[in-house]
């Protein structure tokens, strides 16, 4: 039986190259290589890598980098911002990213956001296009 972890996060140490947006109460790093080693140790064949929003916000470049280094082990999900006027282009570009399997809509203003919000509509329309 193939075992897939449905949600993992990996991240580098906080550096000038890839600075964190916030400093959570987590280990200093859990790199892609460390994640693969941990998966191998417990018999996990693959995982859905969700880019760590709390650290990298909407930049999924580390998730893409890890997926490229470990093809076949990770599928990747990128957070998207409904308040970004270019979010439809972001989604369209993401759909062409090798290993991309989804987006994560980050609702920073959920209490005030209406279901017919234009940003949500842009995301859903872009995601539905083939």
What are these regions (language model features)?
Residues 1-58:
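An N-terminally biased module of ancient metal coordination in phosphate/nucleic-acid-related enzymes
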